C-alpha cells in the first residue's frame, strides 16, 4: 500500500558510480515519475543569504542560518513542501551548494489536516552542510512531521507582543491575502528573518480554516529577483532590504514600517510605499477579536471547531472567524461585519440542527428582515451562495403574498439568480399554494404567475390555476384591459409550455389577443432569445396563430409559422419550407443560427428578388448546407460574374452545377423564377459559352427576353472592359457560332443570338482598323483549326462586315448566316 507521504532530496553531489552535479540524491515511498517531476519543479538551486555564511560555521550558526520553506498545491490532488538550506561547497569545491528536502502529500485533504507552516523547523528536515555531510545525509521513515515552532500559542504571542506593534501590519496583510486568494495581486512581505516570516504565515493560516489554509501557497525566503508575478504563489517573504526591488503588480508590505489603516466601506489601507489595500470584514473583525491573548487563543480553537462542522473546501477565509464571532457578547462590536460575511459566504450542505446551521439561520433571518422590501434589499446585496438562496426564497415567498408589492407599476423586480432547473424550496412551495387562491381574482393570479415564471419556478399548479381560474375570465374585454404586456406573455408561455405545441388550451380569440401583445421580433434578436423569454414567447404566440390560419393566411407572420414548426420539432418544417418560395427574412427568422435542412431554401433562392436578406440567406446556405441543389442556386445569388471568372469557378464548379441548375428550373414554374435569378444565371451561361464550358440549356428561354438578355450583357461588359474577357475572342466566338449550321441536338439559337448582341457591343468599343480585324480573324482561325487562305478570307469578310455595320443591325446572327455562305 502506498503511504500518504513521499520524500525526495536534491543537491549537487558526487557518489560512486554516478556523474557528479545537480541530481536527485534519494527518494522514498515509491515515487512515480509524475510525482518526481512535480516535486522537482519547485526545487530552488540558488540560496543567496543576506549575510554570507562563515567558511566553517558552528552548529549554533548552522541552526540559526536562514532556511526556506515553500508550500503549494501541485498536480490535481497533491500538495508539496520544499525545505531548502545552504549546503556550503560541493564535492568539487564549488561554493553555493544547496540541499533541498521535498515532502509530497498524496492526500492533503484527508485528516489529520495541519497548516503547512507547522512544518517550519521540524527536526526531521535534513540540513547537511559541506560535501561530506551532504554525501552522508539519508532520508528516514516516516518523513518529517509538524514541528513545535509555529503553533496557535506562538502566533498569538507573536501578534500581541507588547514590545513590537504588529497588529496594523496584520490587518493589512489579512486583506491583501484575501484579495490574492481571490485572484488579486500576490503579496510580498518584507521581514527581518525567515523565522518572523514563518510566524506571520502561521498567524494568517490559523485565522482561516485548515482547508482554506491549504490553498495559501507561500515561501518564507525569496529574493526580489526570484519573484514571479504570475507564478501562482500567494505570499512570499523577502528580506527587508529587497522590498524596494519587488516587481510592479505585487502588494508589498513591510513588517518594519507603519501601515496606515483604512475603514470598511471607506478609505483603503495604505502601505508605507503607498500601495492601497481594500478593507474587508476580515480585518475589521480581527481588530475586535485580537485585543487580548486569552480571547485570541480561544478564537483560533473556535475557528477549527467551526470548520469541522462543514465541508472544509472553498471556505471564504473570513467565514470561520465570522462564525466564531457571531453571538459572542465579548465580540459584539464585530457582529455587523460577522453577519455580513456569514450571509454572503456560508457554504452549502451545513448539517441541519448543527450549531453552525443555527448560527447561519439566525443571521440570515436578520438579514432578510420582516418585509418584502427588506428581503428584496438582501437579494440585491448578497453574492451567490446559500445566503443568497435563502434571501431569494424569502423574497419570493413574501412577494407572491404581498398585494401592495404586486400592485406596484411595472414588472415585479427579480434578482440576478433564478430557479430554472432547481427544486422548489419547501417554504416557497407552501407560499405558492396560498398565493394561487382563486379568490384573489384573475389579475392578481396572473401577476403571481408572471413573477414565478420569470423567476424560473416550475410548478404545475401555476398552469392549472391559469387554465381553470384565469383564462375563463379573460373572455371579458374589460378584464383583458387590466392585464399588462408582460403578464400577457407570461400567460401565453405557460399555456404553450406544457407539451401543447398547438395551444389547444387557447381559443382563437384569446390567441389573437395574446399574439398581438408585441410585434414579431427581427431574426437577429430572435436568434439570441432563450426559450420562453419575452422575445421567444412573442414569436411562439404569433407562430401558433399563423399555423392555425395556414400558410395562405399567415401574412406577415409567415416567418413565425416556419420558426414555430422548427421549434416545435414538427416533421412538416422542411416540407413546408421546401414547397414554397418565402421572403428571405422569414426563412432567416425561422432557422436562426441553425443550418437550413436539405433543399428548404431552393425555391426562395430562385424566386426572391435581390436583397441584403437574400444575400445573407445565400451565404448561409453556402457556408452551412450540404444540399447540392441549394448550394448551386445560392452561388448564382451571391457570386458576381467577375468573381466567378477570376476565381475560375467557371472551370471548377460550373460543370457540376449545370445539371443542378437545369434540374431546379425543370420543376420550378418559369413564372416563379425571379428576373434577378434569371439574369445572374444567364450571365453564367454566357461565361460558359465564351470560355468553352457547359451552360444550362434552360437559359435559352431567358435569352429570348430582351430585358433579361440586356441585363445579362450589362453584367458581362465590365469583364470585357477590364480585360478578363478578351474582346477579340468574344467577337470571334460569336461570329463562329452564328455562322455554324444549326445543331438539332443543341437548339440554343437564342443564346447564340444573345452572344451576338454582346459581340456587337464589344465591337462598338473597338477602333475597327486592320489590327482589330486581323486580331479577330486570328482567333477565329485558332478556334476553328482552319487557317487555310479560303477560310481566312471568309473570316475576314465576316469581321469586316461586322465592323462596317456594327452600329446598325439588331440581329447579328440572322445577318451573318447568309454572309458566310456568300
UniProtKB/Swiss-Prot annotation:
Observed effect of gene inactivation: Loss of DNA conjugation when disrupted in recipient strain, no effect when disrupted in donor strain. The recipient strain secretes reduced amounts of EsxB.
A Pfam family that the UniProt record links to this protein: GAP1-N2
InterPro entries in the cross-refs: GAP1-M (IPR045401), GAP1-N2 (IPR045402)
Coiled coil: none
Domain of life: Bacteria
Miscellaneous remark of the record: DNA conjugation in M.smegmatis is unidirectional with distinct donor and recipient strains; mc(2)155 is a donor strain while MKD8 is a recipient strain. Mutations in a donor strain that alter DNA transfer do not always alter DNA transfer in a recipient strain.
Function, in words: May be involved in assembly of the ESX-1 / type VII specialized secretion system (T7SS), which exports several proteins including EsxA and EsxB. Involved in DNA conjugation in recipient (MKD8) but not donor (mc(2)155) strain.
Name the record gives this protein: Putative ESX-1 scaffolding and assembly protein SaeB
Organism the protein comes from: Mycolicibacterium smegmatis (strain MKD8)
Source lineage: Bacteria, Bacillati, Actinomycetota, Actinomycetes, Mycobacteriales
Amino acid at each position: 500500500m502506498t503511504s500518504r507521504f513521499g520524500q525526495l532530496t536534491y543537491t549537487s553531489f558526487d557518489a560512486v558510480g554516478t556523474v557528479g552535479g545537480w541530481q536527485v540524491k534519494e527518494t522514498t515511498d515509491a515515487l512515480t515519475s509524475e510525482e518526481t517531476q512535480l516535486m522537482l519543479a519547485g526545487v530552488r538551486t540558488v540560496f543567496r543569504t543576506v549575510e554570507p555564511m562563515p567558511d566553517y560555521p558552528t552548529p549554533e550558526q548552522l541552526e540559526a542560518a536562514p532556511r526556506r520553506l515553500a508550500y503549494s498545491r501541485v498536480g490535481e490532488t497533491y500538495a508539496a513542501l520544499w525545505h531548502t538550506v545552504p549546503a556550503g561547497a560541493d564535492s568539487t569545491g564549488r561554493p553555493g551548494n544547496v540541499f533541498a528536502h521535498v515532502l509530497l502529500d498524496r492526500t492533503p485533504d484527508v485528516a489529520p489536516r495541519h497548516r503547512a507552516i507547522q512544518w517550519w523547523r521540524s527536526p526531521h528536515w535534513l540540513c547537511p552542510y559541506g560535501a561530506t555531510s551532504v554525501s552522508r545525509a539519508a532520508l528516514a521513515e516516516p518523513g518529517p512531521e509538524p514541528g513545535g515552532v509555529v503553533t496557535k500559542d506562538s502566533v498569538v504571542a507573536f501578534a500581541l507582543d507588547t514590545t513590537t506593534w504588529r497588529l496594523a501590519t496584520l490587518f493589512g496583510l489579512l486583506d491583501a491575502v484575501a484579495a490574492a486568494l481571490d485572484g488579486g495581486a500576490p503579496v510580498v512581505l518584507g521581514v527581518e528573518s525567515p523565522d518572523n516570516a514563518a510566524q506571520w504565515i502561521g498567524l494568517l493560516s490559523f485565522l482561516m480554516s485548515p482547508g482554506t489554509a491549504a490553498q495559501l501557497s507561500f515561501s518564507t525566503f525569496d529574493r526580489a529577483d526570484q519573484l514571479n508575478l504570475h507564478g501562482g504563489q500567494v505570499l512570499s517573504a523577502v528580506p527587508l532590504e529587497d522590498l524596494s526591488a519587488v516587481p510592479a503588480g505585487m502588494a508589498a508590505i513591510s513588517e518594519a514600517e507603519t501601515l496606515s489603516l483604512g475603514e470598511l466601506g471607506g478609505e483603503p489601507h495604505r502601505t508605507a510605499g503607498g500601495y492601497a489595500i481594500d478593507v474587508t470584514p476580515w480585518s475589521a473583525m480581527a481588530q475586535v477579536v485580537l485585543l487580548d491573548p486569552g480571547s485570541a487563543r480561544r478564537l483560533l480553537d473556535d475557528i477549527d471547531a467551526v470548520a469541522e462542522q462543514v465541508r472544509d473546501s472553498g471556505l471564504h477565509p473570513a467565514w470561520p472567524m465570522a462564525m466564531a464571532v457571531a453571538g459572542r457578547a465579548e465580540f459584539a462590536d464585530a457582529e455587523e461585519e460577522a453577519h455580513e460575511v456569514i450571509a454572503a459566504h456560508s457554504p452549502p450542505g451545513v448539517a441541519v440542527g448543527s450549531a453552525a446551521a443555527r448560527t447561519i439561520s439566525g443571521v440570515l433571518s436578520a438579514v432578510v428582515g420582516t418585509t418584502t422590501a427588506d428581503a428584496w434589499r438582501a437579494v440585491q446585496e448578497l453574492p451567490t451562495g446559500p445566503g443568497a438562496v435563502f434571501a431569494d426564497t424569502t423574497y419570493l415567498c413574501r412577494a407572491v403574498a404581498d398585494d401592495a408589492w404586486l400592485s406596484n407599476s411595472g414588472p415585479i423586480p427579480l434578482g440576478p439568480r433564478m430557479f430554472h432547473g432547481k427544486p422548489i424550496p419547501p417554504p416557497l412551495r407552501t407560499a405558492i399554494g396560498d398565493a394561487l387562491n382563486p379568490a384573489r381574482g384573475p389579475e392578481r393570479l396572473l401577476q403571481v404567475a408572471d413573477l414565478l415564471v420569470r423567476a424560473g419556478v416550475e410548478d404545475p399548479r401555476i398552469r392549472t390555476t391559469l387554465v381553470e381560474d384565469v383564462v375563463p375570465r379573460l373572455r371579458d374585454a374589460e378584464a383583458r384591459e387590466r392585464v399588462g404586456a408582460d403578464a400577457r406573455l407570461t400567460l401565453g408561455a405557460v399555456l404553450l409550455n406544457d407539451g401543447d405545441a398547438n395551444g389547444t388550451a387557447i381559443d382563437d380569440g384569446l390567441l389573437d389577443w395574446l399574439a398581438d401583445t408585441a410585434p414579431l421580433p427581427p431574426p437577429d434578436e430572435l436568434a439570441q432569445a432563450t426559450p420562453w423569454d419575452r422575445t421567444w414567447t412573442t414569436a411562439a404566440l404569433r407562430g401558433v396563430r399563423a399555423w392555425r390560419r395556414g400558410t395562405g393566411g399567415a401574412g406577415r407572420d409567415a416567418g413565425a409559422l416556419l420558426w414555430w414548426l422548427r421549434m416545435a420539432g414538427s416533421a412538416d418544417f422542411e416540407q413546408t419550407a421546401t414547397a414554397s418560395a418565402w421572403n428571405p427574412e422569414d426563412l432567416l427568422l425561422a432557422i436562426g443560427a441553425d443550418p437550413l435542412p436539405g433543399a428548404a431554401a431552393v425555391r426562395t433562392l430562385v424566386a426572391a428578388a435581390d436583397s441584403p436578406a437574400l444575400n445573407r440567406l445565400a451565404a448561409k446556405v453556402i457556408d452551412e448546407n450540404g444540399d447540392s441543389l441549394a448550394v448551386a442556386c445560392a452561388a448564382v445569388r451571391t457570386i458576381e460574374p467577375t468573381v466567378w471568372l477570376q476565381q475560375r469557378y467557371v472551370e471548377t464548379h460550373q460543370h457540376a452545377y449545370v445539371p443542378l441548375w437545369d434540374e431546379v428550373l425543370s420543376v420550378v414554374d418559369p413564372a416563379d423564377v425571379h428576373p434577378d435569378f434569371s439574369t445572374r444565371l444567364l450571365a453564367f451561361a454566357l461565361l460558359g459559352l465564351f470560355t468553352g464550358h457547359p451552360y444550362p440549356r434552360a437559359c435559352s428561354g431567358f435569352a429570348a427576353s430582351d430585358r433579361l438578355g440586356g441585363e445579362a450583357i450589362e453584367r458581362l461588359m465590365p469583364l470585357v472592359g477590364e480585360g478578363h474577357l478578351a474582346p477579340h475572342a468574344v467577337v470571334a466566338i460569336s461570329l463562329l457560332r452564328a455562322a455554324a449550321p444549326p445543331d438539332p441536338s443543341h437548339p440554343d439559337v437564342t443564346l447564340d443570338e444573345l452572344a451576338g448582341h454582346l459581340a456587337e457591343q464589344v465591337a462598338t468599343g473597338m477602333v475597327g482598323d486592320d489590327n482589330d480585324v486581323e486580331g479577330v480573324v486570328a482567333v477565329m482561325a485558332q478556334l476553328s483549326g482552319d487557317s487555310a487562305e479560303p477560310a481566312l478570307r471568309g473570316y475576314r469578310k465576316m469581321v469586316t462586315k461586322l465592323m462596317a455595320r456594327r452600329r446598325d443591325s439588331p440581329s447579328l446572327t440572322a445577318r451573318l448566316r447568309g454572309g458566310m455562305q456568300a
